[in-house]
Amino acid sequence: MAEKKEFVVGIDLGTTNSVIAWMKPDGTVEVIPNAEGSRITPSVVAFTKSGEILVGEPAKRQMILNPERTIKSIKRKMGTDYKVRIDDKEYTPQEISAFILKKLKKDAEAYLGGEIKKAVITCPAYFNDAQRQATKEAGIIAGLEVLRIINEPTAAALAYGLDKAGKEQKVLVYDLGGGTFDVSILEIGDGVIEVIATAGNNHLGGDDFDQRLIDWMAEEFKKQHGIDLREDRQALQRLRDAAEKAKIELSTKMETDVSLPFIAVSPSGQPLHLEMRITRSLFESLTRDLVEMTRGPIEQALNDAKLSPQDIDEIILVGGMTRVPMVQRFIKEFFGKEPNKSVNPDEAVAIGAAIQAAILAGTEGAKGRDIVLVDVTPLTLGIEVKGGLFEPIIPRNTKIPVRKSKIFTTVEDGQTEVEIRVYQGERPIARENIFLGSFKLVGIPPAPRGVPQIEVTFDIDSDGIVHVSAKDLGSGKEQSMVVTGRHKLSEEDIKRMIEDAKRYEEQDKRLKEEIELKNRADDLAYSVEKTLREHGDKIPADLKSKLENMIKELRDAINRNDIPRVKMLFDDLQKESMKIGEYLYKSATGGEATNQ
């Protein structure tokens, strides 16, 4: 029996819809239709009362009858502790996402007549490491070897063939999907695609446009009949479907009719029907502010990249919402040029993922095509050090994959373990940043403080997942962790943290200087105390007693956080401790020290 042929695919695992594609031997990319014949699969999973699991269009179709057992937009929960409870079983977001991936895989295998074992899966540029790890886990649960997790805007740029343009260019990707808005600026040239800035709003998308239509129709119906359809889940589901359909039709038509017979029953028992005409101008007046909400993230991305709208060579569209004429007009007015509409915006990300999958797998169609994808870290990564300071190890906007190390030491004599506390953020004080996790390195041989050498390494792989390790260079003992932090950072979180760092710059600087002063004072007290302990017999008793008192006073001031007194006592102890050296030299030379 002949072995089944193996295929590698690219998958756009979307909030609202998902798409799967592959690269043919001739180098063209085909979007693979599902069992229902559609190239787009709704990211919806349903559990019927009989125990059947429905995915995609069949799940979406029965949402009206089974709203409590139907899950949509699970992508929003990736990387969190959220669980879906159906009957007596709980499902993680990864497991729900895996049902979607399994359907895509199964339908594509039936279409291609072979096996799919390897895939590239996409995620938003601003997914943090926990969300990326969850995406990878969903792929593994679905029976896929995930070759790479790549950023959606990067995939879109590949789909538009911009890596083959033969010139350096700045490209802006405007991605307005079902649940999220992302804007990314890429630098493309010589086969390298680099993400140089990203921004967005992870609570703005097609769902919000639908909601405006739902609310308008519900309010009109309420005015006519005194019944709020939004209070009946089945009626609301029918409204939602009608709103989505109307929105799609209004991208090509100037008006559309909505007809929902038997949507409700009057208090007297009469069946009520919803019949309405919606014009494009009405739709635009209801949603104009939503389109306007995309302006801020565009300006932020341009600002971060230090570019003006005129510096952008190409604007590419991703997400079905970019078909809306008002969205396209807004983009044209903002940039003064037409966006590139050469690729189906619903399919661009999956097409790009398929291209990258083919390159990584070395398939026939990808021969001669080599691309380096360069992503960046959204926030600085580092650890907490003495006094609660944040010590950066990988700065914000560092290109990944990356590996960086720093050497640290102990703060107490005889210390046999250290806790490595990992943070992400831009503030110099650790507690003001996002805590990602911690682990302990134990078994450090006892030694005076400052002697052990502990190498802390941060390693961010090509999927953006962070690995942290600590190694005692003396004993070779090592401990590590993969950062799967519970904190889901949205674009707004990232923006807020960067703005906070600017806003509190003066306050943070003062606090950092105070902590550094206390650390230096503590180090000096320790050093002088150690010298007195080791060489006390060579130092006059009155000086020794004076220094011991000064050390005690300095430590008291540190503990009381009396900064002016710490500064004064630190300076005094520094000057007074100089005398130790004189006596040690006298002792060593047997007399007066002479100037050279």
From Swiss-Prot:
Gene3D superfamilies: 1.20.1270.10, 3.30.30.30, 3.30.420.40, Actin, Chain A, domain 4, Substrate Binding Domain Of DNAk, Chain A, domain 1. One of its GO terms (molecular function) is ATP binding. PROSITE patterns: HSP70_1 (PS00297), HSP70_2 (PS00329), HSP70_3 (PS01036). This is Chaperone protein DnaK. CDD domains: ASKHA_NBD_HSP70_DnaK-like. Induction: By stress conditions e.g. heat shock. Belongs to the heat shock protein 70 family. Pfam families: HSP70 (PF00012). Acts as a chaperone. The gene is dnaK. InterPro entries: ATPase_NBD, Chaperone_DnaK, Heat_shock_70_CS, HSP70_C_sf, HSP70_peptide-bd_sf, Hsp_70_fam. It comes from Thermotoga neapolitana (strain ATCC 49049 / DSM 4359 / NBRC 107923 / NS-E). The modification Phosphothreonine is found at T180. Keywords: ATP-binding, Chaperone, Nucleotide-binding, Phosphoprotein, Stress response.
